[in-house]
Amino acid sequence: MTFKHYDVVRAASPSDLAEKLTHKLKEGWQPFGSPVAITPYTLMQAITAEGDVVVSGATEPDWYYVIVLAGQSNAMAYGEGLPLPDSYDAPDPRIKQLARRSTVTPGGAACRYNDIIPADHCLHDVQDMSTLNHPKADLSKGQYGCVGQGLHIAKKLLPYIPNNAGILLVPCCRGGSAFTQGAEGTFSADTGASQDSARWGVGKPLYQDLISRTKAALQKNPKNVLLAVCWMQGEFDMSAATHAQQPALFTAMLTQFRADLSVFNAQCHGGSAADVPWICGDTTYYWKNTYGTQYNTIYGAYKNRESEGVYFVPFMTDGNGVNTATNAPAEDPDIPASGYYGAASRTNGNQVSSNRPTHFSSWARRSIIPDRLATAILNAA
């Protein structure tokens, strides 16, 4: 019996793509369709094969570029559409994460806090999204939880790093977290920040989680290099009367993070923790429309700070000026003929929020968000 396999090849140039495709052809793969430019710096070619094929690149990386993911819900797995681990959300053997939960996946292999484990669509953030399953999910296929962008950021960066290197994601996000409101929670060196931790700031449990896990990722291997921090946060501060304090509190935390990491300067991109870029992502149109003044205060403060190593990445609209898709049912509909079920199929009890347009969709987390974040990392690093 033969099985059909699908995969994608990513490359930084036509010549790079040709070289990689040549290797795949020797392994029994065939091109499927034509190459597509998914970013100005990335070509992608779908490939397919019948029967047994060689799966290349399955060896463990010698070392890792470390990318920290921090902030609140739009920084993590809050995409409600059905996870697609057999296709769009397929893991890659060169992309790992630092563990937090007791098993790699629900009911899967055991792991311990800060182990290096495979990364997938639902990373080990402070808030556990792995049990909020889509009603159409087939858990036997790994379609558990919700969809985030971390895996996809890493996939888009793979063509630009050495073949013996991988990407180690450090997930430290917590939905509903803010600088100016929210429970502080607790921190343990053995388990990280508690799930009820929802307050950012110097010395807070979420900060202790962030800095300790970043250090742990670098301590895993002296060759590991901290490449960037991807930060998406500000929504929950907008609803606070003290929202204007957020920019100063963020800057104080950024300064402290760099100071605390200075002992690892040799493992930081550019040779200093101060040179590691903070890539600060935008939010959905709902927040700007609802809290216009507050949005400008908080997200405006991320802008025009390139000289400080802070880079703002807009997500409000796509290249045609259309609002980036959210979990609103009309923006992530079901497509039964294709076997896809979006946020539209979720109801109370399995939604990430009843206010659907407050969070980006699964498709946005596979496309425009990682495309732009990865491009910003490449431009800044």
Where are these regions (language model features)?
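Terminus-proximal functional modules
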Residues: 1-56
